Amino acid sequence: TAIGSPHVISLIVEKITNNKILFPNIIDPTVDILDVANIRFGKGNVICAKCFISCRVELGNFNLLNVGVAIGHDSTIGDFNVIMPNVNISGGVSIGKENMLGVKATVLQYLKIGDNVKLGANSLLMRNAKNDNLYIGIPAKLMRL
């Protein structure tokens, strides 16, 4: 899943899904998982070097966590998300499916990100993000497409 488009990843998986094909999680050995016993991973995830995953985190299927991503406690991430380098996701965050979080973006604690949301590079999300929208800036604001 090292493809930078959440939608393209979902289309590829849809076309090649087959009971005879396994999709392992690929986790770099430098990834720091705080509480292995209380983490749930789906399938087909790619977790790159120097990521940090705290306790009680749920990660769905076919997500890409690029270099240096940090995920806080009690967070849930759905399917087909692309999270770019050095993104910080605070504790208690809920992220839907097919989202793109730009380089060095930050999501504050207990926020919800819907589906098909794009969060711009270096943006600071301080409010919930609704489906099918683009948010940019500090603080991140809804941009009209």
What are the language-model segments listed below?
Residues 8-12, 129, 145:
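Short glycine-/acidic-enriched loop or helix-start segments at secondary-structure transitions
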Residues 1-32:
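Phosphate-bearing ligand-interacting subdomains
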Residues 18, 143-145:
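Short, Lys/Arg-enriched, disordered terminal segments
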Residues 26-143:
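Structural signal for interior beta-strand "rungs" in well-ordered beta-sheet cores
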